[in-house]
């Protein structure tokens, strides 16, 4: 619950009376006009959930590339243990996301925007998170990658709170769609 959503400098109220409840592994998508405060709301949700001990939330901002180590290969970036079995498992996941063996060994900086996003999303899902908070998760995907990512997110066992303008993502991944406006956050029936 948020009484009012303001800009970062708190100069302007973007929306008031925001209530959002998530049950279990619900997949929620927030839509609304550009500039209404969707990203600001998502940041606040991420901040709030990161404070809780009963939830492990991971946040994917629109500018996620700043968080990736672009000099590492996808396998090295995703491998936290150095264990041979873990590296094999990571390669299998990457293969299921349409990576070639060659792409798995290239520095992340040489990959397409969609391939970088897949690395980031996979790192989130391998982290043990039970809530993913995603700001425009499909914006960099090619028509070939989109279905694979939507399926991966649909099958994620935890909850997802996201913002998207992608109609296919909304239709295939979201259980509930909310509209953010100056009047607050309303469930789309």
Q: Predicted regions: what is each one?
A:
Residues 1-189:
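ABC ATP-binding cassette signature C-motif
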């Amino acid at each position: 619950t948020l009484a009012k959503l303001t800009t970062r400098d708190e100069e302007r109220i973007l929306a008031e009376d925001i209530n959002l409840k998530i049950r279990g592994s619900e997949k929620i998508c927030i839509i609304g006009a550009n500039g209404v405060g969707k990203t600001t709301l998502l940041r606040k949700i991420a901040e709030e959930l990161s404070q809780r001990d009963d939830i492990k939330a991971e946040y994917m901002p629109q500018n996620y590339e700043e968080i990736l180590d672009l000099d590492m290969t996808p396998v090295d970036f995703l491998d936290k243990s150095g264990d041979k079995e873990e590296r094999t498992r990571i390669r299998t996941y990457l293969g299921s996301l349409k990576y070639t063996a060659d792409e798995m060994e290239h520095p992340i900086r040489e990959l397409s925007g969609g391939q970088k996003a897949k690395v980031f999303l996979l790192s989130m899902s391998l982290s043990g998170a039970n809530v993913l908070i995603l700001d425009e998760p499909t914006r960099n995907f090619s028509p070939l990658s989109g279905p694979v990512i939507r399926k991966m997110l649909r099958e994620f066992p935890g909850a997802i709170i996201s913002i998207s303008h992608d109609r296919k993502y909304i239709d295939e991944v979201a259980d509930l769609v909310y509209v953010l406006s100056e009047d607050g956050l309303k469930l789309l029936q």
